[in-house]
């Protein structure tokens, strides 16, 4: 769509990564073989005679709701604020959840697909799903890398790394007593 000049919002897309569909903002309405349905465009296969509506009352309403839900997790994200303005989304519609992570997966996927480090991963499922650094790997791989940090649309990753580093990456004890 982008190569054809069609703008579809997304928070989880990166040119170096495989499509993921995690943010759901790229939702579109497709019509094929007499059926109409909403799909995540970045992972939906193109087929002959497929009709795609990137903007409609229904698509815009769903995107607005998705943005309002994401804003409950990351109300100060500049990217979310920009999209919220485009779709007239209310950042106060849902009760705030102080997690700040919107589970776009950019950090997890970049670390795995580009860096081949697997130092970050998804932990748990459903409403308990989180992004977490794998201490044994992150202690070695992340200190000199941090290439995933600027990809995070909410800045959650930087805060999570600082906390993880403080709690889980202690200096190795020396022969002269405990590490300082």
Ranges and model annotations:
Residues 24, 32-180:
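Fe-S ferredoxin-like electron-transfer domains
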Residues 2-31:
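A basic, amphipathic helix-loop patch mediating RNA/tRNA/ribosome contacts
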């Amino acid at each position: 769509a982008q190569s054809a000049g069609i703008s579809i919002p997304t928070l989880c897309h990166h040119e170096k990564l495989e499509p993921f569909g995690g943010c759901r903002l790229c939702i579109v309405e497709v019509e094929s073989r007499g059926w109409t349905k909403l799909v995540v465009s970045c992972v939906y296969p193109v087929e002959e005679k497929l009709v795609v509506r990137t903007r409609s009352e229904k698509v815009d309403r769903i995107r607005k709701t998705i943005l309002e839900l994401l804003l409950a997790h990351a109300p100060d994200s500049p990217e979310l604020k920009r999209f919220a303005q485009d779709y007239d989304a209310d950042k106060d519609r849902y009760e705030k959840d102080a997690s700040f992570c919107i589970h776009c997966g950019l950090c997890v996927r970049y670390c795995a697909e580009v860096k081949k480090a697997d130092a970050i991963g998804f932990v748990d499922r459903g409403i308990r799903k989180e992004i977490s650094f794998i201490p044994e790997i992150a202690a070695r791989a992340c200190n000199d890398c941090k290439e995933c940090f600027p990809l995070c649309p909410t800045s959650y990753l930087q805060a999570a790394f600082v906390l993880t580093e403080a709690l889980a990456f202690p200096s190795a004890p020396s022969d002269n007593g405990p590490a300082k």
